[in-house]
Amino acid sequence: MEKDLSLTELFDLYGGLLTDRQRELFSSYYIYDLSLSEIAEPEGKTRQNVYAAVKSVKDKLHEYEKILKLKEKNDQLFALAESISGENKDLSDKIKEIIGR
């Protein structure tokens, strides 16, 4: 599975909606960069089981974004902040601070 590192932003936004196990799997694979085998072996699972579980978490994050659109809204606010940075730097900086960028 090719790693889509943009998922880490979705994880930052929606990780609290995942179960502990889902967060652990996501972190192991995407943040700590462990292979499917490295995750599977200590747990006595197959690579395929771990692949399916990681894919499920990935799909869940995309589902949350499709419904809640927090990343989309953050991206729009960031673009707005960038566009007004020349006119009103204080407001631009405040928007960036609010969205955490």
For each of these PLM feature ranges, what is it?
Residues 2-15:
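Short, Lys/Arg-enriched N-terminal segment that forms or immediately precedes the first helix
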Residues 58-65:
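C-terminal flanking helix
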Residues 20-32:
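Short amphipathic alpha helix immediately N-terminal
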Residues 39-40, 50:
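Hydrophobic positions on the alpha-helical face of helix-turn-helix-like DNA-binding modules
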Residues 80-101:
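Helix-turn-helix/homeodomain-like alpha-helical modules used for DNA recognition
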